[in-house]
Amino acid sequence: MKLLTACITPFLPNYEIDFLSFERILYSQKKEGNGVVLLGSTGESLALTVKEKESLVAFACSLKLQIPIVVGVSGTSLNDALEWMKICHAYPIDGFLIPSPIYTKPGVYGQTLWFESLLNTTDKPVILYNIPSRAGTPLYLETVGALASHPSCYGVKDSGGSIERCREYAQIAPHLVVYCGDDSLWPQMHSYGAQGLISVLSNSWPREARSYVDNPYQESNTLLWQELSLWLSLTTNPIAIKAVLAYKQDIAHSVLRLPLSIADLQNAEALPNVVEKMLKWSQIYPVHT
């Protein structure tokens, strides 16, 4: 699972899930052999009911994509998280992505017990998620060290913005797979021990993302990738990537659920230029398949 796409959840104008657009996104990833992460922050999981989340997992599994399907587990209630994992076990998913519980800001001991409680309920591979900007606390090195030998602990996704922290995760648990969780930092994190990328940008450009993950040090590619990644990061995710997908007609609508709004898109006037540059990627820099 070298490249996983952190999938959006597309919505119709009435805020219901747009399964037709969702299917297009999933098949575009299948075509390139990319795995998918459903119901992370990019998928607006906290804005969905349990029933809606299950419907997305069930739909994705029904397509028999034959690519890795990883499901996000978020929230603050341990019982709710355990119940959600139990629901997911009824489907042929391939793993879980689990952040530190949001809002509560646990210390090392509490965070470790939280993850251990969830790891003990599954034999699926689990990726621990460092996302301090949303969780309020980092994924502590001590937590990773304590859980690294657990049979269900598979990897770490690092979206903390620190290349040094990526190196520390790789050192403290060398047998775990470290994923870069920030598109713009992929080359640097790869050189510091990251073995894969969980990408937002690949929602719209799955083939180009696959090429870049496989060849992260080509300077011309890096400059373009950085420019696009930084534009996406100007706005809270997934606002910008939904704007791109709708502009390209990969999804029918750029609708988000509150408190997110497409009206908050930053530097919106650059959108046509962003899309045009990526359309030229394969012409300028051949994609390796």
From Swiss-Prot:
Family assignment from sequence similarity: Belongs to the DapA family.
Organism: Chlamydia caviae (strain ATCC VR-813 / DSM 19441 / 03DC25 / GPIC)
Marked site (Part of a proton relay during catalysis) residue numbers: 41, 103
Pathway: Amino-acid biosynthesis; L-lysine biosynthesis via DAP pathway; (S)-tetrahydrodipicolinate from L-aspartate: step 3/4
Protein name (Swiss-Prot/TrEMBL): 4-hydroxy-tetrahydrodipicolinate synthase
Binding site for pyruvate: 42, 198
InterPro entries: Aldolase_TIM, DapA, DapA-like, Schiff_base-form_aldolases_AS, Schiff_base-form_aldolases_CS
Purpose: Catalyzes the condensation of (S)-aspartate-beta-semialdehyde [(S)-ASA] and pyruvate to 4-hydroxy-tetrahydrodipicolinate (HTPA).
Catalytic activity: L-aspartate 4-semialdehyde + pyruvate = (2S,4S)-4-hydroxy-2,3,4,5-tetrahydrodipicolinate + H2O + H(+)
GO biological process: one example: lysine biosynthetic process via diaminopimelate
Assigned EC number: 4.3.3.7
Gene Ontology molecular function: any one: 4-hydroxy-tetrahydrodipicolinate synthase activity
Subcellular locations according to the entry: Cytoplasm
UniProt KW keywords: Amino-acid biosynthesis, Cytoplasm, Diaminopimelate biosynthesis, Lyase, Lysine biosynthesis, Schiff base
Record-annotated active site: 129, 157
Superkingdom of this protein's organism: Bacteria
Gene: dapA
